[in-house]
């Protein structure tokens, strides 16, 4: 397993829930387990084999069967390592329920990506307890963000960001710890930014119409991070200062040893949400790979 997080109410039963990632489950396809909270008087001691997690309506009719918790799992395709990182996404689609953000760094030839699984009252009525991540958009259960280029490992680290743009919906962070950036900003044919494995962190703004959006060549609810900051995908991109900084993650090739992105809350008391971005291999003041952390203040009215 990778990490576990508490969630707000994902299935609209008035209780907080849990999410646990297992990127090596199912022979490396990976899985993300969402475990529903239960009232105290219904909790009994015991061990839960997490792969046996089930929804209440699908449990055995055998009265001797013991259910410690109900829940559901999101599963990846072979080799995707779904569940490398996960977090509470807040209310990303403005429906009043909590959502879950899950990273999948080896998705689509290691471009990587992340999924947002929308909370819903109807979850308990589903007839299956394993849902393929690829089916989220077509079933109206969530959306997928895809990395830009092969080897970017987008989704190696993900984090809920709170409401950065102050529009009433929460936002998310997705790190791509192996991405290189080459940009000609003024169109003169000369690269203004040329940084190998500097890494980028994408800030994606939440919105109520996310499932109807699509970037060119994709189905609705499936968006390429190449379009960040456009009308297709409102948000922003943070770029590592130097080659090899690994902004947002690092050390392990899939960023599996650091948690380099996080919400900082309102750190300066201005009523706006701030961000923390770590660059584990940055070399400040000639200190080789000492690392840096950037505190980015929230903007807007």
Q: Where are the model-predicted features located?
A:
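Conserved beta-strand/short-helix segments
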Residues: 1-301
